[in-house]
């Protein structure tokens, strides 16, 4: 198990199962929901805003304690509510750097569990503007969940959106540590079940807005994930891109730029498409 440390968030509330969670419980602070022998952590910050941002974690190192809850500072500076979700699969083993919020052998697919939990938390805020945010590996979850919430915005930053290839070390570690996939046949079976390309999975009827930010200096992720998704889904999804150079390689978006982007997207009086344009995103039809 990965080392657990929640001291920075103070004393939280523990729920013995998802059945004990409801919108009435979605108050400011740390909430930990037991899912079997695993823990799902959610950090809520109620800033009395009409906009709520749901965040998903990025890749973490071996030394990073669990949970990783993203966005407390940048959403605070942007003045919006926060619902930050940690990936329980990352807590299973320190070698697991990413779980993409897919689930694991013990709990099965995570989305059927997490979706109603998120829905209750979101409903507690009654937001006029809803944004799902994820950087890198978190971008997969941001896009995956935003597609289920009409009129929401998926703000993805340098995302990995195609897990169907499954050929890198992060995926191999996730498969072995989280699913116990040993041997070629079990590995391929489980990998094909969980390793989904979102370009193929998101329904054409999804009524959300994809604000896709990418660093042009990160050519590998741009060419293998961002560009193919945009090319294949521009015809049936509302997609707008912002391509900036932030440095060579897989580097995060500069903090000030992220805060300003969220501020622009978070204005509910401005239609989503216009807010995206104001934030520098361009739609190619």
Where are these regions (language model features)?
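Alpha/beta-hydrolase active-site loop
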Residues: 101-124
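Alpha/beta-hydrolase fold nucleophile elbow
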Residues: 125-136
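Active-site nucleophile loop of the alpha/beta-hydrolase fold
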Residues: 156-165
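The feature captures the conserved acid-bearing segment of alpha/beta-hydrolase catalytic domains
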Residues: 170-277
């Amino acid at each position: 198990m990965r080392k657990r440390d929640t001291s920075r968030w103070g004393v939280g509330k523990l729920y013995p199962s998802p059945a004990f969670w409801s919108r009435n419980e979605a108050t400011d602070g740390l909430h930990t929901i037991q899912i079997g022998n695993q823990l799902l952590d959610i950090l809520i910050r109620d800033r009395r805003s009409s906009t709520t941002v749901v965040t998903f974690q990025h890749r973490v190192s071996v030394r990073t304690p669990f949970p990783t809850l993203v966005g407390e500072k940048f959403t605070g500076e942007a003045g919006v509510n926060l619902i930050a979700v940690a990936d329980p699969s990352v807590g299973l083993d320190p070698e697991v750097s990413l779980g993409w919020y897919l689930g694991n052998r013990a709990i099965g697919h995570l989305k059927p569990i997490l979706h109603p939990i998120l829905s209750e938390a979101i409903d507690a805020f009654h937001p006029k503007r809803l944004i799902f945010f994820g950087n890198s590996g978190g971008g997969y979850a941001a896009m995956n969940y935003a597609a289920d919430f009409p009129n929401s915005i998926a703000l993805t930053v340098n995302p990995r959106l195609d897990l169907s290839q499954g050929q890198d070390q992060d995926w191999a570690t996730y498969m072995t540590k989280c699913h116990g996939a040993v041997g070629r046949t079990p590995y391929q079976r489980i990998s094909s079940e969980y390793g989904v390309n979102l370009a193929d999975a998101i329904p054409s009827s999804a009524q959300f807005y994809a604000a896709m930010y990418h660093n042009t200096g990160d050519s590998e992720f741009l060419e293998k994930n961002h560009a193919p998704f945009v090319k294949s889904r521009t015809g049936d999804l509302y997609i707008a891109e912002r391509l900036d150079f932030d440095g060579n390689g897989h580097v995060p978006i500069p903090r000030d730029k992220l805060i300003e982007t969220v501020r622009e997207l978070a204005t509910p009086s401005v239609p989503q498409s216009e807010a995206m344009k104001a934030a520098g995103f361009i739609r190619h039809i």
